[in-house]
Swiss-Prot record:
This is Pheromone-regulated membrane protein 5. It comes from Saccharomyces cerevisiae (strain Lalvin EC1118 / Prise de mousse). The keyword Disulfide bond does not apply. It comes from the Eukaryota. The gene is PRM5. PANTHER family: CHITIN SYNTHASE 3 COMPLEX PROTEIN CSI2-RELATED. Residues 238-318 are annotated as: Disordered.
Length: 318
């Protein structure tokens, strides 16, 4: 390989020469100096050539430090790194799909369970209240109420058997206190809404806790015999039976005061009359005459009366 090098052009040089001439005369001496300058450009060109050898890599034969990549395609490293990154991305995507699907199934199952639990057939509620879809008095209106004192020990087992048989044979089973539906405070439509009523939630939890606390007592309530021979256990039956027996004994005023003042129930004369043998005999005589049908009031009870009825039922249980 030949390399041509061009040298710089030479700069012009300045040459200065000085000559002096002296002439002597009698009058004066004149000295003249003549200067002359001459400059010629000097141009010089030089060429040089050199040979540079090409680089030859060492042979791979017998050299352990050189990777033999003859069988591998170009960009092998990029292909390996991209494959690893793709596998990681696909694993994350698959995990996300599985998690989303399982969460969706769990949410649907919980939603279906809650919709069934909050439906009218599975909602548990205690007693009569203005928050119910229909008042509890409709279930106990025009029915025959029999108190515990009116039922002899021998007839209790038979009445329980009759109640079980009538419950299984009846096409439309009666609704117990644990099966009364709530109103629209907690319904399926509200559960599907984003709005949640704190008051309704608190009321529901409070009533549910009362249900769990009062469930042993409700199982020991007296039997109610309806006109269709359907028997139920209810807190309202205890209240109505005590009211009916007190009405038969001519104690309407005392019972009304006892209902409004639950603290005086234990010492009320109507309670003593109910527990006395004379009152039992009079009640039996009145029932034998056909005065077993008690029609409850059409007026809807207030919340305070509802709570007082609950307290009265507890006192009568004890």
């Amino acid at each position: 390989m030949t390399v041509i090098t061009i040298a710089k052009r030479g700069l012009p040089k300045l040459t200065t020469s000085t000559s002096s001439t002296t002439t002597a005369s009698s009058s004066s001496t004149i000295t003249s100096v003549a200067s002359s300058s001459s400059s010629l450009p000097l141009l010089s060109n030089s060429t040089s050539s050199s040979i540079i050898p090409s680089i030859t890599p060492p042979s791979r034969n017998g050299n352990p430090y050189i990777l033999d990549s003859g069988d591998m395609p170009n960009g092998t490293v990029f292909i390996v790194v991209g494959g690893i990154a793709g596998v990681i991305f696909l694993a994350i995507l698959l995990w996300w799909v599985i998690t989303t699907y399982s969460s969706h199934r769990l949410t649907r199952s919980v939603q279906d369970y809650e919709s069934k639990m909050f439906s009218a057939q599975h909602t548990q509620f205690y007693g009569d209240s203005p928050y119910m879809d229909y008042p509890a008095k409709e279930n106990f209106q025009d029915q025959v109420h029999i108190s515990e004192s009116d039922i002899s020990p021998g007839n209790k087992d038979e009445s329980v058997k009759d109640a079980l048989v009538s419950h299984t044979n009846n096409e439309k089973p009666f609704l117990s206190n644990f099966e009364r539906p709530l109103s629209s405070l907690v319904s399926e439509s509200n559960r599907n809404s984003l709005f949640i009523s704190p008051t309704g939630d608190i009321l529901y939890k409070t009533r549910l806790s009362k249900l769990y606390q009062e469930s042993p007592r409700l199982l020991q309530k007296p039997v109610i015999m309806t006109s269709d021979n359907v028997s139920t256990n209810s807190l309202v039956s205890t209240i109505s039976s005590s009211s009916a027996s007190s009405l038969d004994n001519g104690n309407e005023k005392e019972v009304g005061e006892d209902i409004r003042k639950p603290a005086k129930i234990a010492s009320s004369p109507s309670r003593k009359l109910l527990n006395s043998p004379e009152s039992d005999g009079s009640v039996n005589r009145n029932h034998s005459k056909g005065n077993l049908l008690v029609v409850q009031s059409k007026r809807k009870p207030t919340p305070s009366t509802y709570l007082e009825h609950m307290l009265e039922g507890k006192e009568q249980d004890e």
